UniProtKB/Swiss-Prot annotation:
It comes from Halorubrum lacusprofundi (strain ATCC 49239 / DSM 5036 / JCM 8891 / ACAM 34). Belongs to the methyltransferase superfamily. Fibrillarin family. PROSITE patterns: FIBRILLARIN. Residues 1-37 are annotated as: Disordered. Keywords: Methyltransferase, RNA-binding, rRNA processing, Transferase, tRNA processing. This is Fibrillarin-like rRNA/tRNA 2'-O-methyltransferase.
Amino acid sequence: MSEPNLPAGVERREIGGETRLATRGPPVYGEPTADGWRAWDPGRSKLGGMFELGFETGLSGGETVLYLGAASGTTVSHVADFAGPTYAVEFAPRPARDLVEAAEPRDRLFPLLKDARTPKRYAHVVESDVDAIVQDVATRGQAEVAVRNARFLADDGRLLLAIKARSEDVTVEPETVFEGALDRLRETYEILETQRLDRFHEDHLGVVATPK
Protein backbone atom coordinates (compact mmCIF):
# COMPACT_ATOMS: atom_id res chain seq x y z
CA MET A 1 0.00 0.00 0.00
CA SER A 2 1.51 3.33 -1.06
CA GLU A 3 1.00 6.69 0.70
CA PRO A 4 1.34 10.27 -0.56
CA ASN A 5 4.53 10.96 1.41
CA LEU A 6 6.26 7.73 0.34
CA PRO A 7 8.36 7.55 -2.83
CA ALA A 8 7.67 4.94 -5.49
CA GLY A 9 9.30 1.72 -4.34
CA VAL A 10 8.51 2.27 -0.66
CA GLU A 11 5.26 0.69 0.47
CA ARG A 12 3.49 -0.72 3.49
CA ARG A 13 3.39 -4.50 3.17
CA GLU A 14 2.18 -7.38 5.30
CA ILE A 15 5.37 -8.99 6.61
CA GLY A 16 5.47 -11.35 9.56
CA GLY A 17 1.85 -10.68 10.42
CA GLU A 18 2.34 -6.91 10.62
CA THR A 19 1.93 -4.04 8.18
CA ARG A 20 5.42 -2.63 7.80
CA LEU A 21 7.28 -0.05 5.78
CA ALA A 22 9.20 -2.00 3.12
CA THR A 23 11.35 -1.88 -0.02
CA ARG A 24 12.15 -4.56 -2.60
CA GLY A 25 15.66 -6.01 -2.37
CA PRO A 26 17.87 -8.62 -0.72
CA PRO A 27 17.98 -8.43 3.11
CA VAL A 28 20.93 -6.77 4.84
CA TYR A 29 20.50 -6.74 8.63
CA GLY A 30 18.32 -9.74 9.42
CA GLU A 31 15.08 -7.91 8.70
CA PRO A 32 11.97 -10.02 7.93
CA THR A 33 10.99 -10.43 4.29
CA ALA A 34 7.98 -11.54 2.23
CA ASP A 35 7.56 -11.91 -1.54
CA GLY A 36 10.75 -9.99 -2.30
CA TRP A 37 9.91 -7.14 0.09
CA ARG A 38 12.11 -6.39 3.12
CA ALA A 39 10.82 -4.67 6.24
CA TRP A 40 12.29 -1.23 6.94
CA ASP A 41 12.69 -0.90 10.70
CA PRO A 42 12.17 2.77 11.72
CA GLY A 43 13.80 2.03 15.06
CA ARG A 44 17.07 1.31 13.26
CA SER A 45 16.80 4.00 10.59
CA LYS A 46 16.38 7.76 10.98
CA LEU A 47 15.02 8.13 7.45
CA GLY A 48 12.63 5.24 8.07
CA GLY A 49 11.46 7.08 11.18
CA MET A 50 10.95 10.25 9.14
CA PHE A 51 8.75 8.35 6.67
CA GLU A 52 6.76 6.82 9.54
CA LEU A 53 6.21 10.27 11.04
CA GLY A 54 4.89 11.65 7.75
CA PHE A 55 7.72 13.97 6.75
CA GLU A 56 7.38 15.53 3.30
CA THR A 57 10.77 14.43 2.02
CA GLY A 58 10.27 15.45 -1.60
CA LEU A 59 11.42 12.00 -2.73
CA SER A 60 9.41 10.33 -5.48
CA GLY A 61 11.73 7.45 -6.43
CA GLY A 62 14.63 7.20 -8.85
CA GLU A 63 16.55 10.18 -7.46
CA THR A 64 20.33 10.50 -7.38
CA VAL A 65 21.28 10.45 -3.69
CA LEU A 66 24.37 11.31 -1.65
CA TYR A 67 24.17 9.49 1.69
CA LEU A 68 26.47 10.80 4.42
CA GLY A 69 27.17 8.49 7.35
CA ALA A 70 26.15 5.24 5.70
CA ALA A 71 27.59 3.07 8.51
CA SER A 72 27.03 -0.63 7.78
CA GLY A 73 24.34 0.03 5.18
CA THR A 74 21.10 -0.44 7.12
CA THR A 75 19.32 2.64 5.78
CA VAL A 76 21.27 3.33 2.61
CA SER A 77 20.51 -0.17 1.33
CA HIS A 78 16.79 0.66 1.54
CA VAL A 79 17.45 3.97 -0.21
CA ALA A 80 19.28 2.22 -3.05
CA ASP A 81 16.28 -0.13 -3.42
CA PHE A 82 14.05 2.75 -4.56
CA ALA A 83 16.45 5.51 -5.66
CA GLY A 84 18.76 5.93 -8.63
CA PRO A 85 22.55 6.20 -8.22
CA THR A 86 23.26 6.28 -4.48
CA TYR A 87 26.67 7.37 -3.20
CA ALA A 88 27.28 6.09 0.33
CA VAL A 89 29.99 7.86 2.34
CA GLU A 90 31.37 6.10 5.43
CA PHE A 91 34.72 6.71 7.11
CA ALA A 92 35.01 3.94 9.74
CA PRO A 93 36.63 0.81 8.25
CA ARG A 94 34.60 -1.81 10.16
CA PRO A 95 31.10 -0.65 9.15
CA ALA A 96 32.44 0.18 5.69
CA ARG A 97 33.19 -3.52 5.16
CA ASP A 98 29.55 -4.33 5.91
CA LEU A 99 28.50 -1.50 3.61
CA VAL A 100 30.51 -2.98 0.74
CA GLU A 101 28.81 -6.32 1.35
CA ALA A 102 25.36 -4.68 1.30
CA ALA A 103 26.26 -3.00 -1.99
CA GLU A 104 27.36 -6.16 -3.79
CA PRO A 105 23.86 -7.14 -5.02
CA ARG A 106 22.86 -3.50 -5.62
CA ASP A 107 24.21 -2.03 -8.82
CA ARG A 108 23.00 1.47 -7.91
CA LEU A 109 24.81 1.64 -4.55
CA PHE A 110 28.36 3.01 -4.57
CA PRO A 111 30.27 2.84 -1.25
CA LEU A 112 32.92 5.50 -0.63
CA LEU A 113 35.37 5.05 2.26
CA LYS A 114 35.67 8.79 2.87
CA ASP A 115 35.13 11.37 5.62
CA ALA A 116 31.92 13.38 5.12
CA ARG A 117 33.65 16.37 6.73
CA THR A 118 36.02 16.65 3.74
CA PRO A 119 33.83 16.50 0.61
CA LYS A 120 36.67 17.59 -1.67
CA ARG A 121 38.09 14.08 -1.27
CA TYR A 122 35.12 12.53 -3.07
CA ALA A 123 34.07 15.44 -5.30
CA HIS A 124 35.68 13.71 -8.28
CA VAL A 125 33.36 10.71 -7.83
CA VAL A 126 30.00 12.15 -6.77
CA GLU A 127 27.82 13.69 -9.46
CA SER A 128 26.99 17.36 -9.16
CA ASP A 129 23.36 18.36 -8.75
CA VAL A 130 22.24 15.30 -6.79
CA ASP A 131 18.53 15.26 -6.03
CA ALA A 132 18.91 14.53 -2.32
CA ILE A 133 21.45 14.43 0.46
CA VAL A 134 20.54 12.08 3.30
CA GLN A 135 22.69 12.63 6.38
CA ASP A 136 23.07 10.60 9.57
CA VAL A 137 26.53 11.49 10.84
CA ALA A 138 26.89 10.92 14.59
CA THR A 139 29.76 13.33 15.21
CA ARG A 140 30.14 16.88 16.46
CA GLY A 141 29.47 19.51 13.80
CA GLN A 142 26.59 17.80 12.01
CA ALA A 143 25.21 21.04 10.57
CA GLU A 144 28.67 21.97 9.32
CA VAL A 145 28.88 18.66 7.44
CA ALA A 146 25.57 19.45 5.73
CA VAL A 147 26.78 22.93 4.79
CA ARG A 148 30.06 21.65 3.35
CA ASN A 149 28.25 19.07 1.21
CA ALA A 150 25.65 21.52 -0.12
CA ARG A 151 27.94 21.95 -3.14
CA PHE A 152 26.62 18.65 -4.52
CA LEU A 153 22.91 19.40 -4.17
CA ALA A 154 20.72 20.57 -7.05
CA ASP A 155 19.05 23.96 -6.65
CA ASP A 156 15.68 22.26 -6.05
CA GLY A 157 17.18 19.30 -4.17
CA ARG A 158 16.45 18.18 -0.63
CA LEU A 159 18.57 17.76 2.46
CA LEU A 160 17.14 15.06 4.74
CA LEU A 161 19.07 15.33 7.98
CA ALA A 162 18.89 13.66 11.37
CA ILE A 163 20.61 15.68 14.09
CA LYS A 164 21.71 13.67 17.13
CA ALA A 165 21.91 16.04 20.08
CA ARG A 166 24.17 13.81 22.20
CA SER A 167 26.79 13.70 19.46
CA GLU A 168 27.15 17.48 19.71
CA ASP A 169 27.27 18.03 23.46
CA VAL A 170 25.92 15.75 26.20
CA THR A 171 26.00 18.63 28.71
CA VAL A 172 23.55 20.83 26.77
CA GLU A 173 19.79 20.38 26.47
CA PRO A 174 18.83 18.82 23.11
CA GLU A 175 16.56 21.74 22.18
CA THR A 176 19.45 24.16 22.58
CA VAL A 177 21.66 21.93 20.43
CA PHE A 178 18.99 21.75 17.75
CA GLU A 179 18.53 25.52 17.63
CA GLY A 180 22.25 26.04 17.21
CA ALA A 181 22.41 23.50 14.40
CA LEU A 182 19.42 25.05 12.64
CA ASP A 183 21.01 28.50 12.86
CA ARG A 184 24.09 27.16 11.07
CA LEU A 185 21.97 25.38 8.46
CA ARG A 186 19.99 28.54 7.72
CA GLU A 187 23.15 30.20 6.42
CA THR A 188 23.00 27.85 3.41
CA TYR A 189 19.59 26.19 3.45
CA GLU A 190 15.92 27.08 3.68
CA ILE A 191 14.39 24.90 6.40
CA LEU A 192 11.16 23.32 5.15
CA GLU A 193 10.24 21.02 8.03
CA THR A 194 11.52 19.92 11.42
CA GLN A 195 10.17 17.34 13.83
CA ARG A 196 11.52 15.42 16.79
CA LEU A 197 12.18 11.73 16.09
CA ASP A 198 11.83 10.65 19.72
CA ARG A 199 9.13 8.10 18.92
CA PHE A 200 11.90 6.05 17.30
CA HIS A 201 15.19 7.82 18.16
CA GLU A 202 15.61 9.68 21.44
CA ASP A 203 17.07 13.20 21.32
CA HIS A 204 17.09 13.37 17.51
CA LEU A 205 15.64 16.06 15.25
CA GLY A 206 14.60 15.35 11.68
CA VAL A 207 15.14 18.20 9.21
CA VAL A 208 14.04 18.71 5.61
CA ALA A 209 15.72 21.62 3.83
CA THR A 210 16.53 22.94 0.36
CA PRO A 211 19.39 25.18 -0.84
CA LYS A 212 18.85 28.94 -0.67
